[in-house]
């Protein structure tokens, strides 16, 4: 049991190292030639689905509005985002993708799908009962971490 605890600790430390300064962990590498942060790519992916405000993006990404503002300023400057004001309240600004950003957003979405597919492929190495145990373990561990 002690070795399992050590293995879990090593796994979590590796996750932290891989995730440092990133919003999420994705398997594989982006092939885009554009140097964007993971958060910026995720913003583009969210905006490919619908126009959103800074507050809505921050809530969906679970980051501060300041972090979103910083990421958005750079994306606007690079010509990847356009802004529009709310017709009812001109103080509210919505962001939407430009044609330049669409391929990057699509690639990030594909990267998400590849990551989920990889998790599914790893899970198939275990029986359905083992998968249930893994799920219970992960749920309990997340509960302890929070």
Curated annotation (Swiss-Prot):
Amino-acid positions noted as binding Zn(2+) 1 in the UniProt annotation, renumbered to this chain: 24, 42, 108, 112
Gene Ontology terms, MF aspect: DNA binding; DNA-binding transcription factor activity; zinc ion binding
Outcome, altering residue 111 to Q: Does not affect cellular zinc concentration
Keyword Ligase: no
Domain (HTH marR-type) ranges: 1-143
Signal peptide (residue range): none
Effect of residue 108 to Q: Strong decrease in zinc binding. Increases cellular zinc concentration
Gene3D superfamilies for this protein: 6.10.140.1680, 6.10.250.2360, Winged helix-like DNA-binding domain superfamily/Winged helix DNA-binding domain (1.10.10.10)
Pfam entry (one): MarR
InterPro entries: AdcR-like, ArsR-like_HTH, HTH_ArsR_DNA-bd_dom, HTH_MarR-typ, Metal_resp_HTH_trans_reg, WH-like_DNA-bd_sf, WH_DNA-bd_sf
DNA-binding region: 54-77
Keyword Nucleus: no
Superkingdom of the source species: Bacteria
Activity regulation, short description: Zinc acts as a coregulator and is required for DNA-binding activity.
PROSITE patterns referenced in this protein's UniProt entry, alphabetically: HTH_MARR_2
Binding sites annotated in the UniProt record for Zn(2+) 2: 30, 41, 107
Function summary: Zinc-responsive regulator that acts both as a repressor and as an activator by regulating directly the promoters of its target genes. In the presence of zinc, directly represses the expression of the adcRCBA operon, of genes coding for a group of surface antigen zinc-binding pneumococcal histidine triad proteins (PhtA, PhtB, PhtD and PhtE), and of adcAII. Can also activate expression of adh.
Assembly notes: Homodimer.
Note: The second zinc-binding site seems to play no significant role in the regulatory process. Its function is unknown.
Name this protein carries in UniProt: Transcriptional regulator AdcR
């Amino acid at each position: 049991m002690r070795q399992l605890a050590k293995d879990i600790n090593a796994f979590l430390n590796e996750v932290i190292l891989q995730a440092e300064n990133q919003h999420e962990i994705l398997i594989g590498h982006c092939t885009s030639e554009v140097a964007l942060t993971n958060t910026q790519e995720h913003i583009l992916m969210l905006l490919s689905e619908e126009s959103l405000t800074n507050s809505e993006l921050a809530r969906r990404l679970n980051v501060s509005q300041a972090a979103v503002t910083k990421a958005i300023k750079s994306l606007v400057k690079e010509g990847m985002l356009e802004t529009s004001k709310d017709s009812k309240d001109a103080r509210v600004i919505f962001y939407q993708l430009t044609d330049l950003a669409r391929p990057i957003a699509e690639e990030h979405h594909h990267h998400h799908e590849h990551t989920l597919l990889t998790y599914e492929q790893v899970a198939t190495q275990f029986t359905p009962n083992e998968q249930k145990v893994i799920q219970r373990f992960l749920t309990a561990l997340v509960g302890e971490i929070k």
